[in-house]
Design a protein with these regions (language model features):
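N-terminal membrane-anchoring/stem segments of glycan-assembly enzymes
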Residues: 1-48
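Long helical/loop segments within the catalytic core of UDP-sugar-dependent glycosyltransferases
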Residues: 22, 102-107, 111-114, 120-124, ...
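Cell-envelope/extracellular polymer assembly enzymes that use nucleotide-activated donors
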Residues: 53-56, 84
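Acidic helix N-cap motif at the loop->helix transition within catalytic regions
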Residues: 69, 94-102, 149
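Short, acidic, metal-binding catalytic loop of nucleotide-sugar glycosyltransferases
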Residues: 73-82
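A conserved acidic beta->alpha catalytic loop
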Residues: 81, 89-98, 117
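Short aromatic/hydrophobic "clamp" motif used to bind/position activated sugar donors
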Residues: 137
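The conserved acidic donor/metal-binding loop of glycosyltransferases
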Residues: 141-145
Length: 186
């Protein structure tokens, strides 16, 4: 026992207590500030809905015809409703153009843009951003689907802290049983 202590004294007396102390402090801070955080969210939600800024949702993609409709449906279920959907077709050679044209005519998407020559996702995103009219821009993949309150959760940090300039999200794979690649991402 003494040889273990003499060899690993730093671990037992410095590192482990430091780790556990910090862990307990973080947990304690979360528990004591939970009401404050919820109050900040409620105030931010009030200001968000009072201002009601337009959000531009950019959806660049190539050969995403089979996914676009599901993504548009998940956006239709959002709790935050003031948004425009800009789909940029990056030179698809499947039936994406037909589906997006139908969605545009039916009013489900605001803009449908098509690049005849493939330029890649960045070029499609930049092209779509030129058409964006919103105060905020959200970039989505065509095969994405969102929780009902995702747009609201994306926007709230801008109203909680005025220094926030960008927000990222936690992406979870929902179709993790479909392909080997999707199961590896999950």
């Amino acid at each position: 026992l003494s040889s273990i202590l003499s060899t690993y004294w730093f671990l037992f007396f410095i590192e482990m207590p430091r780790y556990y102390l910090l862990e307990y402090l973080v947990i304690f801070n979360r528990l004591t500030n939970k009401n404050k955080i919820e109050k900040e969210k409620e105030v931010a939600r009030f200001y968000l809905y009072r201002e009601n800024p337009l959000v531009s949702i950019l959806v660049p993609g190539k050969n995403e015809g089979s996914h676009i409709f599901k993504m548009v449906n998940s956006l239709a279920e959002q709790t935050y409703r003031n948004y425009e959907i800009i789909v940029v077709d990056d030179g698809s050679d499947d039936y994406t153009k037909l589906i997006c044209t139908d969605l545009y005519r039916a009013g489900y998407i605001t803009h449908y843009l098509r690049l005849e020559d493939r330029g890649g996702k960045a070029a499609a995103s930049n092209y779509g951003a030129q058409m964006a009219k919103g105060k905020y821009i959200v970039c989505l993949d065509a095969d994405s689907s969102l929780d009902r309150d995702a747009l609201e959760k994306i926007l709230l940090p801008f109203y909680i802290d005025g220094m926030v300039k960008g927000v990222g999200g936690c992406v979870k794979v929902r179709n993790n049983k479909d392909t080997i690649c999707s199961s590896l991402q999950a």
